């Protein structure tokens, strides 16, 4: 098997998130344990991944790999999720980072504007820790790889580690790119030649319709980008960014006539380029990256927080929270960017055509489709929020007046007075937040009204 194929298999393993393996176990020994786990049995949530692994492990190049340096046994947080797999026969060592874990979506958003993020830095710390603990030398071939967020981390490690002479290759599977400031920082630190030398080690392997690798600024050399066929049923949107679908095929059930997904242990063929969804995602990313950094930061933060909420978390792993300004950036700039990328680009029209099973949309959208923005609800909320702020301020004044009217002997009760003053301050902060939100919504309504005027002039 090629290094690329082995990397894809190991990235599939990472999503089982099995923490009961002991360092020193082979892949075959781990799979034997997993065979008794309900999640890996037919109908279990990881049956697809397990099927890929068991079939791939028939090849001793996979089955004999030895796991080591598991981050969960080294004191790292749940977001780091990394380990190494070594081949005793060839001496090759694979350093593998799992994709976006619990609480990591906001960190993805920060990577769109920041030079580095907390989770990227922890990934680097893990790599250098593993090198020093394991006494890894130049005699071993070292491969760094990861999928999605893990692919971004693998690239970051390749570009940032002080042990750059140990990294022979990096396989980025569906991983996003970086901010302008991150790239500028590397160029300044290493010089143009040093920057190019490091990034030439990176190979990008992307699903044909993956929608994550296009985010940010790619540092993968264009001649080292490959797209893999990922047959995904239309209703399974998440499958386009799922590494196991690089091992999938759609087969017709002879009994029902419907197509079902079947997983195997061999990587699918490469295809010439992106599919319709992948091309649209790239166009949308271009619109986002053209925004001023502060607006882009707000849009990215909102999108990533929505992804985090989908997983049941209200804050990021490192305590990241949305601000009113972030939400305002998304509504005023992010939604219009999505509109432009869907309706005003060829990639967006092709994506819609594929979604609705039509062959093509007219290149001239004028007279064929109208985007209607009903901002009356937002406008109504402006006044409602303003009235609510007034009511809160009234309550604040009542609390302060009550505190002032207290008899002297009661005012000497330090705990009571402090409680009343604290409540008044809390109410004041709440009123200020409501007023800020009201003002923000008012500005957004104005922006949409101006956009409607501009659109009406086009028709």
Question: How does the language model describe each region?
Answer:
Residues 6, 27, 49-50, 58, ...:
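Short amphipathic alpha-helical segments that mediate assembly, nucleic-acid/protein binding
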Residues 121-124, 128-218:
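Serine-dependent carboxylesterase/thioesterase catalytic core
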Residues 35-142, 161, 165-171, 180, ...:
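A conserved cap/lid and substrate-binding interface adjacent to the catalytic center
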Residues 200-206, 212-329:
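Charged, amphipathic alpha-helical linkers/stalks
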């Amino acid at each position: 098997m090629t290094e690329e194929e082995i990397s894809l298999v190991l990235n599939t393993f990472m999503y089982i998130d099995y923490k009961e393996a002991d360092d020193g176990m082979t892949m075959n020994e781990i799979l034997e344990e997993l065979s008794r786990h309900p999640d890996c049995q037919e109908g279990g949530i990881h049956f697809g991944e397990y099927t890929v692994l068991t079939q791939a492990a028939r090849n001793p190049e996979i089955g004999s790999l030895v796991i080591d340096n598991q981050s969960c046994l080294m004191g790292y947080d749940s977001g780091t999720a990394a380990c190494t797999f070594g081949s005793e026969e060839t001496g090759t060592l694979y350093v593998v980072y799992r994709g976006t874990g619990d609480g990591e979506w906001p960190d993805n958003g920060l990577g769109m504007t920041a030079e580095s993020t907390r989770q990227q830095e922890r990934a680097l710390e893990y790599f250098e820790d593993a090198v020093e603990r394991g006494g890894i030398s130049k005699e071993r071939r070292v491969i760094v790889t990861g999928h999605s967020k893990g692919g971004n981390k693998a690239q970051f490690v390749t570009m940032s580690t002080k042990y750059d002479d140990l990294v022979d290759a990096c396989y980025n599977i569906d991983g996003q790119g970086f901010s302008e400031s991150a790239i500028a920082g590397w160029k300044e630190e290493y010089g143009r030649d040093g920057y190019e030398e490091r990034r030439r080690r990176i190979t990008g392997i992307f699903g044909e319709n993956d929608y994550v690798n296009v985010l940010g600024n790619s540092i993968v050399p264009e001649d080292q980008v490959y797209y893999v066929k990922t047959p995904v049923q239309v209703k399974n949107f998440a499958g386009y960014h799922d590494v196991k679908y690089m091992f999938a095929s759609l087969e017709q059930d002879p009994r029902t006539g419907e197509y079902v997904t079947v997983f195997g242990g061999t990587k699918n063929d490469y295809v010439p380029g992106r599919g319709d969804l992948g091309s649209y995602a790239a166009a949308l990313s271009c619109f986002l990256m053209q925004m001023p950094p502060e607006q882009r930061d707000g849009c990215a933060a909102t999108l990533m927080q929505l992804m985090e909420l989908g997983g049941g978390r209200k804050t990021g792993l490192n305590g990241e929270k949305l601000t009113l300004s972030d939400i305002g950036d998304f509504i005023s700039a992010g939604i219009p960017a999505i509109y432009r990328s869907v309706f005003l680009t060829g990639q967006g029209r092709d994506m819609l055509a594929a979604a609705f099973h039509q062959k093509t949309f007219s290149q001239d959208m004028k007279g064929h489709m109208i985007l209607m923005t009903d901002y009356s609800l937002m406008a109504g909320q402006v006044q409602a929020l303003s009235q609510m702020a007034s009511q809160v301020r009234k309550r604040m004044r009542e609390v302060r007046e009550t505190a002032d009217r207290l008899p002297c002997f009661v005012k000497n009760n330090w705990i009571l007075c402090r409680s009343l003053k604290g409540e008044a301050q809390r109410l004041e902060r709440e009123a200020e937040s409501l007023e800020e939100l009201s003002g923000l919504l008012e500005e957004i309504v104005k922006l949409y009204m101006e956009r409607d005027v501009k659109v009406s002039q086009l028709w």
